[in-house]
């Protein structure tokens, strides 16, 4: 949070009383290493360095000392945030949490269906306290438009989320729900394509999937989408971290993001592209969900095992509930809890 404030250097000096240095953001590499070395040479008493829009570097003669220094500095920052943050970091709440299960099921199916036209995707839903505080706030759209907090997150979450109308508004227009969602997705897709065209240079990797990863809905929560469940969940966790950073920065000062150009340079960095190319190909049923009846029996169990081994998420059912629970635990141990329900 301190690293993303518009007066971050000033706040760092105030919190650490000269014991922590500051460097403006730049991509990791040899030049950044030289700047850090130069800063340490000129300030031999500092315990760490904050890199703007990124985070904290600490060191020590031993790994234990380095860890201890890191914990000490983080606790000092947390104490400052806790004592200084205002009540409504994102502005006063203008929405309240709302629940309407039948419509929510339709909404989830509609959004996932529209996002899966070209490539099947899996949804992760988050209704945590920080998510509801953010999506129900007065300044949701303004803060969301600044972009996510940490450059490391861009590949997971994209720079910007998509913000939909409130759940009440969507319910009121239930008969036009497909049109509303499709229009918002098209708007996001076109804006992302323009962002790519504005910032690409010779040798830039090709345009990636232009659709949103993170979708925010006032009164409801956050949806994240990816080609598999674990990636969707991690993307959600990353954006929860981003919202906490935004809350800290907005609650004391003003949250700032990287420039659009620099954000693009990170998102489409050759090193990041190399990471993507090294990832194993998706399995045949990645992005799919299967409902399996009689899953505790021989045929159902074998079917579930085959689907899971091909990357599918499965929902297991059986009239023998005790046998079903045992089989479910067996599959969770083998394939992970993200894909077994």
Language-model-detected regions and their locations in the chain:
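Generic hydrophobic, amphipathic alpha-helix propensity
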Residues: 299, 324-327, 331
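Canonical Rossmann dinucleotide-binding motif of NAD(H)/NADP(H)-dependent dehydrogenases/reductases
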Residues: 283-315
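Short, well-ordered alpha-helices that flank and scaffold nucleotide-derived cofactor binding pockets
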Residues: 38, 305, 309, 329
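Conserved glycine-rich Rossmann-like NAD(P)H-binding loop of the short-chain dehydrogenase/reductase
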Residues: 310-327
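Hydrophobic anchor at the start of a short beta-strand
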Residues: 214, 314, 321, 339-341
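A generic structural signal for alpha->beta connector loops
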Residues: 19, 45, 311, 337-339
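Rossmann-fold cofactor-recognition segment
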Residues: 331-341
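Glycine-rich flexible loops
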Residues: 1-290, 302
